[in-house]
């Protein structure tokens, strides 16, 4: 019974843009398309899902190229069997003389001798052209396994033939046991034992081999150090061993003094008789000796010159420093006298040269006299303090009334203040009313006030309170 004859006629394909049978548009499962391929390439009739047909499971969307040509031929009505192009007025239909399928002129471009037409050259499709030109022998050789595979299979069959004759009538398990037993026997066979002659020949060959010299330990260490990038052990400097000094400190001092005395004696002997003796010896020599003595004499002169210049520069710096100090002292003295310190020059206080001892003593006496005058001026000015008040501490009379406290009102907090100078933390001797009652020593008060403040600021003597008066 022909099953295909009972199928209804299939509608034509509406896809004119397809180039081949396997190039249909991708369709989702369960879709409905007018592709009437019985066997699964879409839906041929309504109510059938994708991949189903009257013949069971279909070919699937990707199996159109492997479908039966007879089935696909029914669906390719008025279309090219090779590129699925619809035949039109400009795309005419041609038939293959061998298989009879419809092709366009582009797909039917091969020529071959067709047996149906008396081996005459006819237009055929590509598949028929390959079949007709290669023949059956070519197809057989195309799908035939290689010769090496055939030889191995034949050798395996020949090897298994005797075992098959012995294992006839045995079950599968018995055959497996027999094969395992044969393998164990093959493994337990004694190996080939070499003869006495072979052993002697091998021993003689080993003795005849030329044995190289064994490297020494030093060579191996050197090679290892070279590979690791380290210093060779032979080139490593040995650590110097210093014996401990067992001398006492007094002995070390005495030895050091002896060494210094010996070095001084050598220097004195070289300075005393060395140059003269060398010059006398150079009189009997030619050129090289005289040149060496000249070089040595020149070097000594240069060294003496450098030393004298250094001493002169040092003396000049000391002289400048001394003059600056004298000028500063003169300006300070002029300020205390009430003169303009800018008009004071160093000519007024020029000291004689220090080469003369008597003049230097005179200069020292002059400086001392100036300092004495400065001290007397400080006492004369007194910073508005009487001399007897500066020498005698301030005490309150016993019979003083409480109203006397109004003259110099002091809060209770000031009684606990520290008796130190507010600048240098020395013992305070003055209290300046113009500086909010701050405590000063005589030196800081003089340096911290200018000429106007020294005249205007009122001061009073200050003595630190005793321990019994604090509380």
Swiss-Prot record:
A motif (MIM1-B) lies at residues 326-339. Zn(2+) 2 binds at residues 96, 99, 125, 128. Its main location: cytoplasm. One of its GO terms (cellular component) is Flemming body. The record marks 145-146 as: Breakpoint for translocation to form KMT2A/MLL1-ZFYVE19. Residues 278-299 have a biased composition (Polar residues). Residues 311-375 form a coiled coil. It is linked to A chromosomal aberration involving ZFYVE19 is associated with acute myeloblastic leukemia (AML). Translocation t(11;15)(q23;q14) with KMT2A/MLL1. Cholestasis, progressive familial intrahepatic, 9: An autosomal recessive form of progressive cholestasis, a disorder characterized by early onset of cholestasis that progresses to hepatic fibrosis, cirrhosis, and end-stage liver disease. PFIC9 onset is in infancy or early childhood. This is Abscission/NoCut checkpoint regulator. The gene is ZFYVE19.
């Amino acid at each position: 019974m022909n099953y295909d004859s009972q199928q209804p006629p299939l509608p034509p394909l509406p896809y004119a843009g397809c180039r081949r049978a396997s190039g249909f548009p991708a369709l989702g499962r369960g879709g409905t398309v007018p592709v009437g391929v019985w066997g699964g390439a879409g839906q041929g009739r309504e109510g059938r899902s994708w991949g189903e047909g009257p013949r069971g499971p279909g070919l699937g969307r990707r199996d159109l190229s492997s479908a039966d040509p007879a089935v696909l031929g029914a669906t390719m009505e008025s279309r090219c069997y090779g590129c699925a192009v619809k035949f039109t007025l400009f795309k005419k239909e041609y038939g293959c003389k061998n298989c009879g399928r419809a092709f366009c002129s582009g797909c039917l471009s091969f020529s071959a001798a067709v047996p149906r037409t008396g081996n005459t050259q006819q237009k055929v499709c590509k598949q028929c052209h390959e079949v007709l030109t290669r023949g059956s022998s070519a197809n057989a050789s195309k799908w035939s396994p290689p010769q090496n595979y055939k030889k191995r299979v034949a050798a395996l069959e020949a090897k298994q033939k005797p075992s098959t004759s012995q294992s006839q009538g045995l079950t599968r398990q018995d055959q497996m046991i027999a094969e395992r037993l044969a393998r164990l026997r093959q493994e337990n066979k004694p190996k080939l034992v070499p003869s006495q002659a072979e052993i002697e020949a091998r021993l003689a060959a080993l003795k005849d081999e030329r044995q190289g010299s064994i490297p020494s330990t030093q060579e191996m260490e050197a090679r290892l150090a070279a590979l690791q990038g380290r210093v060779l052990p032979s080139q490593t400097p040995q650590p110097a061993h210093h014996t401990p000094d067992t001398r006492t400190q007094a002995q070390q001092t005495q030895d050091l003094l002896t060494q210094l005395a010996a070095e001084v004696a050598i220097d004195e002997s070289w300075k005393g008789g060395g140059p003269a003796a060398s010059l006398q010896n150079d009189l009997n020599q030619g050129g090289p000796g005289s040149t060496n003595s000249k070089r040595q004499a020149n070097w000594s002169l240069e060294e003496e010159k450098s030393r004298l210049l250094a001493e002169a520069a040092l003396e000049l710096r000391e002289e400048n420093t001394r003059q600056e100090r004298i000028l500063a002292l003169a300006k300070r003295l002029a300020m205390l006298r009430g003169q303009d310190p800018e008009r004071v020059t160093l000519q007024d206080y020029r000291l004689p040269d220090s080469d003369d001892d008597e003049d230097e003593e005179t200069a020292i006496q002059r400086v001392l006299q100036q300092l004495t005058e400065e001290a007397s001026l400080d006492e004369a000015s007194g910073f508005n303090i009487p001399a007897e008040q500066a020498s005698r501490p301030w005490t309150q009379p016993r019979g003083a009334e409480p109203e006397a406290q109004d003259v110099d009102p002091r809060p209770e907090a000031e009684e606990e203040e520290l008796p130190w100078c507010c600048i240098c933390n020395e013992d305070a001797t003055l209290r300046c009313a113009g500086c909010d009652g701050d405590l000063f020593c005589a030196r800081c008060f003089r340096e911290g006030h200018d000429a106007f403040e020294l005249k205007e600021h009122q001061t009073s003597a200050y003595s630190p309170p005793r321990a019994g008066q604090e509380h």
